[in-house]
Amino acid sequence: MPEQNATAPQWLSPVEMKAWRSYIIASRHLLEALDNDLEGHDLSMPDYEILAQLSDAPERRLRMSELAEITLLSRSRLSHRMKVMEKAGWVKREACPSDKRGFFAVMTPKGWKAIVAAAPDHVASVRSHFVDHLSNQEQVVLAGIFSRIEESFRCEVIEG
């Protein structure tokens, strides 16, 4: 590691590095496993997340801009996913009557059937790859940690 000076980066300590690397590796494995477990339903994790958000929304519809924000997808990435999902018949886009440039993402009955079919397997996957490895106390601590980190990003967006 380079010598420390006023302009040198503050390198991670061994404990910090272990925590960081463990998080990165575990999260990549977790997302890959969840994605693989959805393959039997012809869904990807982003598809599932989009359908899950739409299934919870009033009338199973959200403005595209709101859906992009909720799912943390760029507008272009969401647009690409929507094209794939429209082709599969899970969603459709509808023009927003109050905003000529705006569109709604709307879940179709086929999309509803897809998420209803996939949800039990997805929950089982989340349990086996994540929840079952943590005690209730660890789940509470982890939720607190990631809520704090998530909040720091929200503050950056508001301030930025």
Language model: regions and residue ranges:
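N-terminal leader segment of winged-helix/HTH proteins
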Residues: 1-41, 140
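Pre-recognition alpha-helix immediately N-terminal to the DNA-recognition helix
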Residues: 18, 22, 49-53, 113
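Short, hydrophobic-biased segments on the C-terminal half of alpha helices
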Residues: 64, 82-83
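N-terminal helix-turn-helix DNA-binding core of bacterial DNA-binding proteins
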Residues: 28-76, 158-160
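Short, locally clustered residues in the helix-turn-helix/winged-helix DNA-binding domain
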Residues: 24, 52-59, 119, 147
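Charged, amphipathic alpha-helical coiled-coil/dimerization segments
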Residues: 5-7, 83-144
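C-terminal regulatory/oligomerization modules of transcriptional regulators
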Residues: 1-14, 136-160
